[in-house]
Amino acid sequence: MTEKLFYEDSHRTEFTAKVISCEEAKDGYRVVLDQTVFFPEGGGQYADTGVLGTVNVTDVHEKDDVIYHYTTEPLEVGSIVTGKINWEERFEKMQQHTGEHIVSGIVHERFGYNNVGFHLGADYCTMDFDGTISKEQLKEIEAAANEAVYQDLEIEILYPSKDELKDMDYRSKIEIEGQVRIVKIPGYDVCACCAPHVKTTGEIGAVKLVSMANYKGGERITMLCGRRAMRDYEKKDAMTKEISALLCAKEYEVADAVGKLKDEQTRMKSQIAELQQKLLEFRVAEIPVEEKIVTVFDSALSGNLAREMMNRLLDKGAVICAVFAGTDTDGYRYVIGSRSEDVRPISKALNVAFEGRGGGKPEMVQGSVKGTGKAMKELLMQYK
């Protein structure tokens, strides 16, 4: 059994311990100490990292009350080592985890929903609830959670007896055997939890509920607390300032500026489409259709316009029409059609000769090819 020093003081970062065992493991070694500050993976929270002496600790697991430290190098059995956890990583995780307890407690109290899933990753934290939450309710939850932070409430850790536990109203996702550890945030939450937490709610700094999505009939909320929330704000603030400068708009008016830009883009697309149609009409009018196969190469045609040009030239009287959009450098997209001929052999010939892909029905084929327009025209001459 490993003595769990992280339960005595969640802010403790260094300790000394005796090496009980050291065994080879996948990608390193598995070390057992008589006591540790390293928290193993559990309760939805991933394990601490750090060092034992000069050896890196990459992961920590627990089984049958024994904590296993996975290291990059071996440690001598019986030796005394000094361990140190990555404090910034631990503190950030505690900020997220205690923030999750507050939010889950508020949701449970106000709406009666249970937290049915929790993931604390390296970059974000998600909570799954078994009921639906509106955008307005999400704002209310966030405001209430931050009110708990402002109150700087002391986090209470309780180890109730079985009799005390029977009379205690607390949240728990699973049935727990043995001693139950309760994390209590006065006025907000009482929950069974095995992970270390901050000492007061003020240490969380801030709670930001950044997104919400429907998930398995309920809601999945993504949250950032403390330092993570600050980094997220700094990144978004920098982006807002950059967009503000690009649009020559005040920071709090960038959404309106983007909306105007989008409207302008829609108008321009409409005007471009009208001009493309007029240009297409001029192009079709000047292309002769006396030959059996009419071939058109144009670098500016989109897929829809290429198909429309083909149909218009067929309407004009072309027996077979092949339209190529692209360049010798970038390759070509082609569409070939006919009202009376099977054009699939032409597609097959192009694909073989020019590393092409594509096909279709007897009356129309589409695809892409690589090569020069000159060489493609020479191949198509065979069908005149």
Predicted region positions:
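A glycine- and charged-residue-rich anion-binding loop/surface
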Residues: 1-384
